[in-house]
């Protein structure tokens, strides 16, 4: 076996802020090339890299305390190094925010996953990371066929959810909801797929909007510390990611995800803002049409559709930020290889 790029592992070395990380590379006996660009950023290039090769970003740690994705990525990288994992796709593995991970917190100064638009933002540690990640994505996707580009941004939810795992497809100007992407979701046994209805400022949206990548934000269970995640809950996802990297068709059966559309985004407008439920409410909790579930100033917040459900409720966001998504279950179909709904 070729000498490892890592003293311990990709994840351990990334989190060890006491040791420096230098850019370096190695070629495995099977011809696969590993390039460590910087702390937490590893590029893997297959021996037979060509115009037909997929170019896949697998990112984790955008929120520092969401550790299950980091552990999944670390195991895949280890198996690539040993030769156990076949590599036919060019991959960029990212563990984004080790300082926040070591502090067991989502972020240090600013929510990193709201910094990938082109708006002016206040200086912060996270803004520096976002700018670096934008450059890395550009370099990775430059001179690659549009149809080869994928980005799976892996997260965990803060709260419990009626769907243990779910994926969010960002809204872009481009055809970024291909049948291949939906097939990936279904083979991963991800329980729900949310179709966003407006642009956002997330990492996956950035790749989809600016590089037409087939991109998802994937929410995998709940936040836990490294070593405390039950990775067996994500066996199907792990297998499907590995099959994607090997460019083979999964052998296990798919489980179709329930599809939702985002019906609206609740943005906090007033200091006097609250929900009528406590912080233990689950993602995808639904309401009857007309049911009041909170207020913003003197305006009641109420369900505008039967069984309209709430996702990512956060009563503590700053004024002007998203306080929740409201979603409705839909029947979707494919037109010209793209997932659409009426």
From Swiss-Prot:
NCBIfam families: PRK05324.1. This is Succinylglutamate desuccinylase. Keywords: Arginine metabolism, Hydrolase, Metal-binding, Zinc. Signal peptide: none annotated. GO terms for molecular function: hydrolase activity, acting on ester bonds; succinylglutamate desuccinylase activity; zinc ion binding. Pathway: Amino-acid degradation; L-arginine degradation via AST pathway; L-glutamate and succinate from L-arginine: step 5/5. The gene is astE. Binds 1 zinc ion per subunit. GO terms for biological process: arginine catabolic process to glutamate; arginine catabolic process to succinate. Transforms N(2)-succinylglutamate into succinate and glutamate. The active site is at residue 219. Belongs to the AspA/AstE family. Succinylglutamate desuccinylase subfamily. Its cofactor is Zn(2+). SUPFAM superfamilies: Zn-dependent exopeptidases. Zn(2+) binds at residues 63, 66, 155.
């Amino acid at each position: 076996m070729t000498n490892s790029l890592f003293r311990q592992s990709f994840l351990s070395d990334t989190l060890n802020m006491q040791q420096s990380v230098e850019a370096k590379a190695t070629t495995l006996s099977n011809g696969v090339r590993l390039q460590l660009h910087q702390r937490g950023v590893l590029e893997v290039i297959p021996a037979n890299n060509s115009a037909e090769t997929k170019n896949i970003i697998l990112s984790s740690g955008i929120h520092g305390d969401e550790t299950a994705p980091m552990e999944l990525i670390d195991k895949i990288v280890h198996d690539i190094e040993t030769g156990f994992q076949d590599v036919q796709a060019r991959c960029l593995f990212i563990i984004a925010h080790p300082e926040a991970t070591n502090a067991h917190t989502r972020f240090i100064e600013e929510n990193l996953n709201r910094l990938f638009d082109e708006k002016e933002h206040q200086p912060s540690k996270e803004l520096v990371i976002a700018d670096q990640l934008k450059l890395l994505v550009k370099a990775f996707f430059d001179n690659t066929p549009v149809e080869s580009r994928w980005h799976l941004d892996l997260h965990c939810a803060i709260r419990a959810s009626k769907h243990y795992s779910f994926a969010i497809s960002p809204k872009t100007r481009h055809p970024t909801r291909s049948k291949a992407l939906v097939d990936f979701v279904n083979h991963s046994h991800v329980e729900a797929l949310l179709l966003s209805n407006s642009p956002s400022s997330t990492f996956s949206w950035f790749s989809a909007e600016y590089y037409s990548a087939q991109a998802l934000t994937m929410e995998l269970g709940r936040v836990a510390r490294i070593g405390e995640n039950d990775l067996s809950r994500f066996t199907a996802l792990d297998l499907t990611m590995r099959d994607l990297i090997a460019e083979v068709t999964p052998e296990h059966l798919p489980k179709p995800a329930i599809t939702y559309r985002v019906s609206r985004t609740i943005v906090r407008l007033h200091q006097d803002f609250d929900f009528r439920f406590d912080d233990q409410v689950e993602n995808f909790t639904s309401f009857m049409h007309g049911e009041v579930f909170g207020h913003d100033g003197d305006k009641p917040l109420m369900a505008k559709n039967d069984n309209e459900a709430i996702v990512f409720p956060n009563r503590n966001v700053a004024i002007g930020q998203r306080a929740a998504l409201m979603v409705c279950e839909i029947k979707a179909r494919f037109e010209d290889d793209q997932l659409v709904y009426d």
